[in-house]
């Protein structure tokens, strides 16, 4: 932390006090002479002036007890030490020479002024009140340079090391605390000392010089509480780190709690003890043991009460996420995307898994992460389906082309087979029609293969035979058919018309024949009459049986009488 930046943040209240605090160089030189004139034995033995100041401050002890809460708040936490360790390390390397000289002057001024004002009625509550109001937000660069430990047998060592510590304080060098490790330049030694780092008495901050006063019982309690080990705070930091490493769901809530704790540590006032205060504080370790117990119990209660709202919120989020997952499964079942709700819960497809994670996410960061994963998985699945469809279309196109080629070849083959079948049918037809013979089947005579001009075919002349007229052209027919046809000597004109129609040629209609047409017309007249069907058949039969015109006339007269009887 830069020194100029630190002085730019001073309060107007502190600026008003600076003219009073800046004293001449002669006072500082006088203070150095007084301190150097003491012998080590005198410094170790004579402590009557310390006891006199403590007795004077006992008169105002009830007023000091009113600020117990403020003293508890003045105790620094490991988060403060870890927070300010890196800043103090950086600033110590950059401006070490300036800060040490300036801090030595102010430190000597404060000690000299405290020795002169030793008879003040109530120095500590006034200083504590000023410290509470000013509220130092950041640590000074010269603070927390070395570790501290719990003092146990320090009364014996105080007398031995008092001379050395006094000289170090006057010279401005950082002292080495009893039972503590020596100074180390690396940052890890300062950050990992579990809150045991101790602020040196030399500081350049003008706002906190009032704190460096003569010791009092209340200030000793604060020093003891600072030097006390706090395993509960270590456990709290460990549990916080484990929570952030194990589960990402509690990340946002743990950040909020850590930010809140940093804010509290920044706004809490700080008390910087001096060497004399630390020496007197060792004598009252047993007296203030109960107070340190009370503070550690409070710290335990605070640490126990912190993670409970986080677990409650996560439980509520899990309950709501389960209901949202169930609602999503029901919606998918109703839309027909999946068959059952159980199938959605057991499904291992990427989009379904990301959807379930998104519905169960605790904050917006995880929700957006899972939403992006779901969209990418859906896009990937769609691309896979598109590729599958493309391959299927290619296969179908190839099959269509091959089927076209097959159809073309098959049609050509079919045409060839059809032509062969037609040729075979034509040859079979010729063979069956001629009976296996190429010539005329009716011609039984043998015809010469070569015709000459000199020869002509002679027509065979048949002599007249009177029996040929009776036989007609039936000389080759069998006797049964001939006998059947010759048996009917009576010529029936109706039967003759019916039988001779298929054999009649076109020239036969030119010959006048009155009977055929009259019988046909009479038949049509009888069929169109209103008589019954049986009567019509009877009249037609009688017409066919008529042999002369007179019989036909008689039949038609009877027909007319029946028609007249029906009409009348």
Swiss-Prot record:
InterPro entries: Paramyxo_PProtein_C, PProtein_oligomer_dom1, RNA_pol_Pprot-P_XD_paramyxovir. The N-terminus consists of a long intrinsically disordered tail. The central part contains the coiled-coil multimerization domain (PMD). Forms a four-stranded coiled coil structure. The C-terminus constitutes the alpha-helical domain that binds to the nucleocapsid (N-RNA complex). CDD domains: MEV_P-protein-C_like. Residues 1-25, 55-322, 434-455, 494-513 are annotated as: Disordered. One of its GO terms (biological process) is viral genome replication. It holds the Pfam family Paramyxo_P. The gene is P/C. Residues 191-216, 441-450 have a biased composition (Polar residues). Homotetramer. Interacts (via multimerization domain) with polymerase L; this interaction forms the polymerase complex. Interacts (via N-terminus) with N0; this interaction allows P to chaperon N0 before encapsidation and form the N-P complex. Interacts (via C-terminus) with N-RNA template; this interaction positions the polymerase on the template. Residues 412-445 are annotated as: L protein binding. Belongs to the respirovirus P protein family. Transmembrane segments: none annotated. The keyword Transit peptide does not apply. This is Phosphoprotein.
């Amino acid at each position: 932390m830069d020194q100029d930046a630190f002085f730019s943040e001073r309060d107007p209240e502190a600026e008003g006090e600076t003219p009073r605090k800046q004293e001449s160089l002669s006072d500082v030189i006088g203070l150095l002479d007084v301190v150097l004139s003491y012998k080590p034995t005198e410094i170790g033995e004579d402590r009557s002036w310390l006891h006199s100041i403590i007795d004077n401050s006992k008169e105002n002890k009830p007023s000091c007890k009113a600020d117990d809460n403020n003293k508890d708040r003045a105790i620094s936490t490991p988060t403060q030490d870890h927070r300010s360790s890196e800043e103090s390390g950086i600033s110590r390397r950059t401006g070490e020479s300036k800060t040490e000289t300036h801090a030595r002057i102010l430190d000597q001024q404060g000690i000299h002024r405290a020795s002169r004002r030793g008879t003040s009625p109530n120095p500590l509550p006034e200083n504590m009140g000023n410290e509470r109001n000013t509220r130092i937000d950041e640590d000074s660069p010269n603070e927390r340079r070395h570790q501290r430990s719990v003092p146990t047998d320090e009364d014996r060592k105080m007398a031995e090391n008092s001379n050395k510590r006094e000289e170090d304080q006057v010279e401005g060098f950082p002292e080495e605390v009893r039972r503590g490790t020596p100074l180390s330049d690396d940052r890890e030694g300062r950050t990992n000392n579990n809150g045991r780092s101790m602020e040196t008495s030399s500081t350049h901050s003008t706002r906190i010089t009032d704190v460096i006063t003569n010791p009092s019982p209340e200030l000793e309690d604060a020093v003891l509480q600072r030097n006390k080990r706090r395993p509960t705070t270590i456990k709290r930091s460990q549990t916080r780190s484990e929570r952030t490493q194990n589960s990402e769901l509690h990340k946002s809530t743990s950040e909020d709690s850590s930010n809140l704790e940093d804010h509290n540590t920044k706004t809490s006032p700080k008390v910087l003890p001096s060497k004399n205060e630390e020496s007197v504080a060792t004598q009252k370790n047993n007296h203030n043991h109960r107070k340190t117990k009370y503070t550690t119990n409070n710290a335990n209660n605070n640490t126990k009460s912190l993670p409970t709202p986080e677990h409650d919120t996560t439980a509520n989020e899990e309950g709501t996420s389960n209901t949202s997952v169930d609602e999503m499964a029901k919606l998918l079942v109703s839309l027909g995307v999946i068959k059952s709700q159980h199938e959605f819960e057991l499904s291992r497809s990427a989009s379904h898994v990301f959807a379930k994670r998104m519905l169960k996410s605790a904050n917006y960061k995880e929700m957006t992460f899972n939403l992006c994963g779901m969209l990418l998985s859906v896009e990937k699945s769609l691309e896979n389906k598109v590729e599958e469809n493309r391959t299927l279309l290619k296969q179908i196109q190839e099959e269509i082309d091959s089927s076209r080629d097959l159809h073309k070849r098959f049609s050509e083959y079919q045409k060839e087979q059809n032509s062969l079948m037609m040729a075979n049918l034509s040859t079979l037809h010729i063979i069956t029609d001629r009976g296996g013979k190429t010539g005329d089947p009716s011609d039984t005579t043998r015809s010469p293969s070569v015709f000459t001009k000199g020869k002509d075919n002679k027509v065979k002349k048949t002599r007249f035979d009177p029996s040929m007229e009776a036989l007609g052209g039936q000389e080759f027919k069998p006797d049964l058919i001939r006998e059947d046809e010759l048996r009917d000597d009576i010529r029936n004109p109706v039967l003759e018309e019916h039988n001779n129609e298929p054999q009649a040629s076109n020239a036969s209609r030119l010959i006048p024949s009155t009977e055929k047409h009259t019988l046909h017309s009479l038949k049509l007249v009888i069929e169109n009459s209103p008589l019954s069907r049986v009567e019509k058949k009877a009249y037609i039969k009688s017409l066919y049986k008529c042999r002369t015109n007179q019989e036909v006339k008689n039949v038609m007269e009877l027909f007319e009488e029946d028609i007249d009887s029906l009409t009348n």
